[in-house]
């Protein structure tokens, strides 16, 4: 039996969770009340059903089931797992909107595709066959028939009328489709999805679990393999802080996108502005300069097919991914960001609270750099030149 990457914990035999502890110390599903057998053929050889169907040997033989994909809190009973005519795969997941079903979809779709390619019959099930299992079947239908979420959902619902993925799973299915029915680590929405999951863990544990350490990107000042050509540096000491791919772009919300203002018009506009404090003027100038520089290098720096670029994106605040040089971000829920070289304050971070940009957009979790504290540079053949 194939297992998900998450580890299952041993439960005592007296647990009320509907499972029975085996000698191996692994909880399996033995006692349950999932109602009568419920199973429907959604596509040729692909069946969607409930736990009762997956544990009823006569049903499995009647529908000539050869493969079972289980999405539940515990695995199937041992006598099903040991059946010689069955190949099984188990994903440990609860039916909750904040559960990360997205990380499993690609593997589940591959399992279904492989089984059908062998002329087998696949049963995908959870407890009632309503949310977790239907989400997986919808993901398969999206990829198999090149469908967006809604047509795939309606196709499955036409075969099994009471399917209903929870709201969190629906959002993740739409993201799965946006990424081409695969995990694209360069997709900005996927990055934000992973950050939000990590933020939930930080809220509970006050420390970043090892399973989420990958959301913290390597330090670009140390990385020497395939360095990115566009970087952000500390304005004071010119230490590399972030690469262009680390930036989480956003559109202005409360004001319309502004075009880059030509220098001569900029000077006239500046003459009409009321007097500002030094910090206000510095921040305004820094954000404006970043907008101009980003516009000039946009085509050369956004060449990655997985990068989602939005025209006229805001630079009032520079939201970035968490990066390894950010001191103690794995051990604190929020704090300030300082340059690791000159110790100048560069911005702030929070895993648990939203940060609102002056444009009106919010980001949660938020790791941001103050535009006036950094500068955009372009590297040419390992020689850094300020644009």
Curated annotation (Swiss-Prot):
- Please state how the activity of this protein is regulated: Inhibited by the tyrosine phosphatase inhibitor sodium vanadate.
Documented EC number(s): 3.1.3.16, 3.1.3.48
Enumerate composition-biased segments (Polar residues): 1-15
List the PROSITE patterns.
Answer: TYR_PHOSPHATASE_1 (PS00383), TYR_PHOSPHATASE_2 (PS50056), TYR_PHOSPHATASE_DUAL (PS50054)
Q: What is its main location?
A: nucleus
* CC annotations in GO: cytoplasm; nucleus
Q: Which Pfam families match?
A: DSPc
Disulphides: none
Q: Active site: which residues? A: 126 (phosphocysteine intermediate)
GO molecular-function annotation terms? Answer: phosphatase activity; protein serine/threonine phosphatase activity; protein tyrosine phosphatase activity; protein tyrosine/serine/threonine phosphatase activity
Q: Which reaction does it catalyse?
A: O-phospho-L-tyrosyl-[protein] + H2O = L-tyrosyl-[protein] + phosphate; O-phospho-L-seryl-[protein] + H2O = L-seryl-[protein] + phosphate; O-phospho-L-threonyl-[protein] + H2O = L-threonyl-[protein] + phosphate
Q: Where in the cell is it found?
A: Nucleus; Cytoplasm
In this chain, the stretch annotated as Disordered covers 1-27, 248-267
Provide one Gene Ontology biological process annotation.
negative regulation of MAPK cascade
Domain Tyrosine-protein phosphatase residue range list: 35-182
The domain of life for this entry's organism is: Eukaryota
Q: Which family does it belong to?
A: Belongs to the protein-tyrosine phosphatase family. Non-receptor class dual specificity subfamily.
Q: List the PANTHER family.
A: DUAL SPECIFICITY PROTEIN PHOSPHATASE 12, DUAL SPECIFICITY PROTEIN PHOSPHATASE 12 FAMILY MEMBER
Q: What is this protein called?
A: Dual specificity protein phosphatase MPK-4
**Organism expressing this protein natively:** Drosophila melanogaster (Fruit fly)
């Amino acid at each position: 039996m194939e297992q998900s990457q998450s580890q299952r914990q041993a439960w005592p035999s007296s647990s009320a969770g509907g499972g029975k502890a085996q000698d191996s110390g692994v909880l399996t599903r033995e006692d349950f009340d999932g109602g009568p057998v419920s199973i429907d053929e959604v596509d040729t050889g692909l069946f969607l059903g409930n736990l009762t169907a997956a544990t009823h040997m006569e049903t499995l033989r009647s529908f000539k089931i050869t493969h079972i994909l289980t999405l539940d809190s515990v695995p199937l009973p041992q006598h099903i797992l040991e059946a010689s005519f069955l190949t099984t795969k188990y994903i440990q997941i609860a039916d909750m909107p904040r559960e990360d079903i997205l990380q499993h979809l690609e593997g589940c779709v591959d399992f279904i595709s492989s089984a059908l390619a062998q002329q087998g019959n696949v049963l995908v099930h959870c407890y009632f066959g309503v949310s977790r299992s239907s989400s997986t079947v919808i993901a398969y239908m999206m990829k198999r028939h090149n469908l967006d979420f809604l047509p795939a959902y309606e196709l499955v619902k036409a075969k099994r009328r009471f399917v209903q993925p929870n709201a969190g799973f629906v959002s993740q299915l739409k993201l799965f489709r946006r990424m081409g029915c695969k995990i694209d680590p360069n997709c900005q929405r996927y990055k934000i999805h992973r950050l939000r999951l990590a933020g939930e863990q930080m809220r509970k544990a006050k420390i970043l679990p090892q399973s989420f350490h990958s959301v913290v990107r390597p330090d670009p000042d140390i990385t020497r393999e395939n360095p990115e050509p566009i970087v952000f540096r500390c304005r004071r000491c010119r230490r590399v802080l972030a690469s262009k791919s680390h930036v989480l772009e956003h559109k202005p919300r409360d004001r319309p996108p502004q075009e880059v203002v030509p220098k001569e018009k900029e000077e006239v506009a500046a003459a009409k502005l009321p007097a500002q404090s030094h910090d206000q003027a510095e921040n305004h100038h820094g954000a404006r300069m970043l907008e101009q520089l980003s516009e000039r290098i946009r085509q050369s720096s956004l060449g990655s097919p997985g990068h989602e670029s939005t025209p006229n994106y805001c630079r009032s605040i520079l939201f970035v991914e968490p990066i390894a040089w950010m001191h103690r971000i794995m051990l604190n829920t929020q704090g300030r960001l300082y340059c690791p070289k000159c110790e100048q304050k560069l911005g702030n971070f929070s895993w648990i609270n939203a940060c609102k940009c002056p444009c009106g957009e919010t980001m949660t979790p938020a790791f941001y750099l103050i535009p006036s504290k950094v500068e955009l540079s372009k590297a040419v053949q390992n020689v850094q030149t300020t644009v």
